């Protein structure tokens, strides 16, 4: 029988879902269409995949106390994981050849509207 997650882990999970919901809402208000949430691959998970026109945006959502903390929370290992997962997702798209991609971050801060940071990091492509 599987153990129940601790109360703090459950709270973090709920906070993550709320943050991703807020981030998705902020992106939709900017004209993006959400294609996937918590997209899992063998390399890891992409929080949100959004599209506007021929631009596909792979979004890492960070709920932190400040924008600086959110930016610092994306390390090189996270970048590599997101890039590898993005490559897999893109390769499965029929219109792969005409799509542009970008790696963004949405910071979910206390009592503020989410902050969308375009080009939070640059992929190796």
UniProtKB/Swiss-Prot annotation:
GO MF, one annotated term: nucleic acid binding
Disulfide bonds: none
HAMAP family assigned to the protein according to its UniProt record, in alphabetical order: UPF0102
Family per similarity comment: Belongs to the UPF0102 family.
Protein name: UPF0102 protein mlr4633
């Amino acid at each position: 029988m599987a153990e129940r997650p601790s109360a703090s882990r459950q709270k973090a999970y709920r906070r993550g879902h709320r943050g991703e919901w807020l981030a998705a809402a902020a992106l939709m208000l900017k004209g993006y269409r959400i294609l996937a949430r918590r997209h899992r691959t063998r390399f890891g998970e992409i929080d949100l995949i959004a599209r506007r026109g021929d631009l596909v945006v792979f979004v890492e959502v960070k709920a932190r106390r400040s924008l600086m903390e959110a930016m610092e929370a994306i390390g090189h290992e996270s970048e590599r994981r997101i890039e590898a997962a993005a490559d897999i997702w893109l390769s499965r798209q029929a219109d792969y050849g005409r799509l542009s991609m970008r790696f963004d971050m949405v910071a979910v801060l206390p009592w503020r509207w989410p902050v969308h940071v375009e080009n939070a990091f640059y992929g190796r492509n």
